[in-house]
Amino acid sequence: RKWGGAAVFWQVDCSGRVHTGKIMLYDATTGKRVKHPQPHVCWVHTEMRQKDYNLRLCFFGEHLLPLYPDRKVFVVESEKTAAIASHFMPDVLWIATGGKNGCFNERTISALTGRDVVLIPDLGATQEWQARLPMLGKVCRSASVNDVLEAMATDEQRSQGLDIADFLLMEDTPQMILQKMIDRNPALQTLIDELDLQIVEEP
């Protein structure tokens, strides 16, 4: 277990080919990246010591594109953000570039051919991502940048470079509230399992 329990975000393309895995360590309490005293980011192919490995990045979540050909695609920067946002808004596809400048080239964006795509950049990166629209417009059915975060963010939030996942997690979902209750009283999980209880959300 790398660094005592890091997460691996696998990059799998539309054809099901595994390109690599990005290994990152997160703080179990805050959910934030551990960046001190070192970045705590590395790659599976590096850890496996594969010689002459030719890394060709693809979007995180790209393997879902052919499974849901009619769904709108939301593109974010962080792999973690894509995973979290998919919990809150499962009716669209969430994929990640893996970095502010990652995966924005003609080869990788070909995976988005014919799709309706919405870019949701981190705070402070909106202008840079808007500059990607002409390139995306050549292959996507439609491409736009959603700047709702910039419109609603405070100066402090902008200085922190928050992303959509940070805003989504500011309010607990019923599932999150239940998990906190289970953490405080693990016997509750046994009761839920034995009675086959389900969360019922109000319409």
PLM segments and residue spans:
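Phosphate-handling DNA/RNA-contact segment within nucleic-acid enzymes
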Residues: 2-113
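TOPRIM fold recognition
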Residues: 31, 70-71, 80-203
